[in-house]
Amino acid sequence: MKDLKILITLLLILFSVGIYSIEANQKVENFRLNDQLGNSHELFYYSDHEALVFLVQGNGCPIARNASVRFHELEKIFSEKKVKFFMLNSNLQDTKRSILEEAASYNYQLPILMDKTQLIGEALEVTRTGEVFVINPKTWQIAYTGALDDRLTYENQKKEASEHFLKDALDEITEGRAVTLATTESLGCLINFPEQRNKANHKLISYSEDIAPILIDNCTACHRKGGLGPWAMTDYNMVKGFSLMMREVLRTKRMPPWHADPSIGHFSNDRSLSAGEMRTLVHWIESGSPRGKGKDPLLEAEISDSVWSNEPELGPPDYVIDIPTTDIPATGVVDYKYHFVKNKIGKDIWVRATEIIPGDKAVLHHVITSFGEINVKGPRKGRLNFRTMKGLRGYAPGIN
């Protein structure tokens, strides 16, 4: 009998560990995700709110579908109290199209943040759809995590809930009180996080074979000596030193600088990272950025800095316009600068290609080039005439 009691106790301890995923008072790091409509949401942008509420959504989960009705009702109650509601989808199998179809079928009116890399769900340790969690923007900690209420179980559902866990927590937060019940058991469909189970293997990610090639293909065009990046990826030590900053800008999508929606069409010169590349980089950083074996490809990388990138196809340029050198102060506000260059061609021509070559990529932010006639009188004297002005070429960081 004593052995049986010990076994039961152990089972209860193990079971209790597995009930809850997100921990109350857990600190939440900043992230950015797109919703099903293409809108971008950065967590820390909502710092002026009283609370941020998330329902973990997944297509096909009956509990999440059922809970969404009450979740929308609570949104209408608390939106006037500066509480923002979201859904979070970390399912591997759900696509943007299928999420849109699910939203239309069940009348979801809230942003569904699509965590296609699963990095955010992993970091939050989400386990099931139907789970709700509340973030307090004053501390960026989890204020409540668990079930929305006690109305739903796996086999049954009550007509009315007798315990209103989420509503009670939001009442307390918006009234400036501490949350009395910060954690409850959540029910729903288990979410498959394969990389979470393979966490031990993240230390085996190869810097030489996996990490450095991603950086060379996607980052070193800017992050190199003389490039427009603020620091140069010259070797492993530099990358390791900036690795935590890299993780931050990857999670918030500040890097790589690419804003087009990857689910719509194909874009030339796409600088975005694939979901697999994002996972590889972040998991490598989270495992301590191990050096591993092999050469350092960054030491041997040949970074092309072609002055005239069209030369292989079109040959040397027919016309080169030099802009006078300008000294830019290291700090302060610089007025918008206009440079006028006389067109010396003297005849109409067809333009096949143009290119802007910055003198210092670390200083130049952008260029807009136009051509046309100059105003000789009026308030815009000495400036281009809008009626004759035509655009020619632009430049901004990251443009090829």
Region spans (language model):
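Bacterial N-terminal signal peptides
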Residues: 8-18
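A short beta-strand-turn-helix
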Residues: 31-52, 200-209
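Short active-site neighborhood of thiol/selenol oxidoreductases, capturing the structured segment around
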Residues: 44-65, 170
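Conserved redox-active cysteine motifs that mediate thiol-disulfide chemistry
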Residues: 57-70, 220-224
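Structural microenvironment flanking redox-active thiols in thiol-disulfide oxidoreductases
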Residues: 65-106, 113-123
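Thiol/selenol-based redox catalytic cores and closely related redox-interacting motifs
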Residues: 117-192
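Aromatic- and Gly/Pro-enriched helix-to-coil junctions and flexible linker segments
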Residues: 183-341
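Low-complexity, glycine/serine/threonine/alanine-rich intrinsically disordered linker
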Residues: 294-400
